[in-house]
């Protein structure tokens, strides 16, 4: 069967977006892994699925699958692309959209020239909300790594789990070595996204993220939210911060006790069709 899809990206964090309202398809783990292959498939960090909502207050249901086929709760760059996709495909004429995710409701607002502002919901910090194994809540935790190496982390749930550590320079940070250890650390029973943040000043940070089930990506929207909130909680950052990632910049806003707002661009790369039989086992 032919499957229609759209390739999009948010700051280089790239997606295959599939409308399963207007067409039907079954995409299992092995099929998603084959589609994600950058040599023999479409190639993407995440697969984004558009479905009818299960709850009356939502316009759409938004499902996210990593390149390894695992389903995850949230993707910030993805939700911006999702919002643009459903609007440009005329699945809705709304510019303020209510979207159901595994993590709850998010509310993207479409702006001009592909820019989208998203209400990302409330950050969570308690260990059982991440989830993270700890005897009691703390501002910072020490994580034991291989070769007697320790790092200091903050933990934040932005619809998906994040560990944030501050580094002197993101360019020289050992993301490839430390990232996988943090991602699969036994204290994170559902694994975690590992963020490495360099504070430039109180309104500007640089960030690299080793994403759960994907590896390091050019950008991570929820990671940018988690890092900014972590820095704000530590008193290092103002309430509106520019987060600079390899793929570009996001603006993150947060006031204590309020929701997090993320603003950033989206890019429509191309539309395509493929014969799904070649990707199924």
UniProtKB/Swiss-Prot annotation:
Q: Where is this site: Could be important to modulate the pK values of the two catalytic cysteine residues?
A: 162, 211
Which EC class heads this enzyme's classification?
A: isomerase
This enzyme catalyses:
(2S,6S)-2,6-diaminopimelate = meso-2,6-diaminopimelate
Q: Does the keyword Isomerase apply?
A: yes
| Molecular function GO terms recorded | diaminopimelate epimerase activity
Q: Does the keyword Transmembrane helix apply?
A: no
Signal sequence annotation: none
The record's Gene Ontology biological-process terms are: lysine biosynthetic process via diaminopimelate
Gene3D superfamilies, sorted: Diaminopimelate Epimerase, Chain A, domain 1
Q: What is its EC number?
A: 5.1.1.7
Q: Where is the site described as Important for dimerization found in this chain?
A: 270
Report the PANTHER family cross-referenced here.
Answer: DIAMINOPIMELATE EPIMERASE (PTHR31689:SF0), DIAMINOPIMELATE EPIMERASE, CHLOROPLASTIC (PTHR31689)
The record's comment on protein family reads: Belongs to the diaminopimelate epimerase family.
Identify this protein by name: Diaminopimelate epimerase
Species of provenance: Acinetobacter baumannii (strain ACICU)
């Amino acid at each position: 069967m032919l499957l229609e899809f759209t390739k999009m990206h948010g700051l280089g964090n790239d997606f295959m977006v599939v409308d399963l309202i207007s067409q039907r398809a079954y995409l299992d783990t092995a099929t998603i892994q084959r589609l994600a292959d950058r040599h023999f498939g479409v190639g993407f960090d995440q697969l984004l699925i558009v479905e009818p909502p299960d709850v009356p207050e939502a316009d759409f249901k938004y499902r996210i699958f990593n390149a390894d086929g695992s389903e995850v709760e949230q993707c910030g760059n993805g939700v911006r692309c999702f919002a643009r996709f459903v609007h440009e495909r005329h699945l809705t004429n709304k510019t303020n959209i209510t979207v159901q995710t595994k993590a709850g409701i998010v509310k993207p607002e479409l702006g001009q020239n592909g820019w989208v502002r998203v209400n990302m919901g409330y950050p969570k910090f308690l260990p059982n909300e991440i989830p993270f194994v700890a005897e009691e809540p703390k501002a910072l935790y020490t994580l034991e790594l291989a070769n007697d190496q320790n790092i200091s982390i903050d933990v934040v749930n932005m619809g998906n789990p994040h560990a944030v550590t501050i580094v002197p320079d993101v360019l020289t940070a050992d993301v490839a070595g430390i990232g996988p250890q943090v991602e699969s650390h036994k204290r994170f029973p559902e694994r975690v996204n590992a963020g490495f943040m360099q504070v430039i000043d109180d309104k500007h940070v640089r960030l690299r993220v080793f994403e759960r089930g994907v590896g390091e990506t050019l950008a991570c929207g929820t990671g940018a939210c988690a890092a900014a909130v972590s820095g704000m909680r530590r008193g290092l950052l103002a309430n509106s911060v520019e987060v600079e990632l390899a793929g570009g910049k996001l603006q993150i806003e947060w006031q204590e006790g309020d929701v997090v707002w993320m603003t950033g661009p989206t890019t429509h790369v191309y539309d395509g069709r493929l014969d799904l039989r070649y990707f199924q086992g």
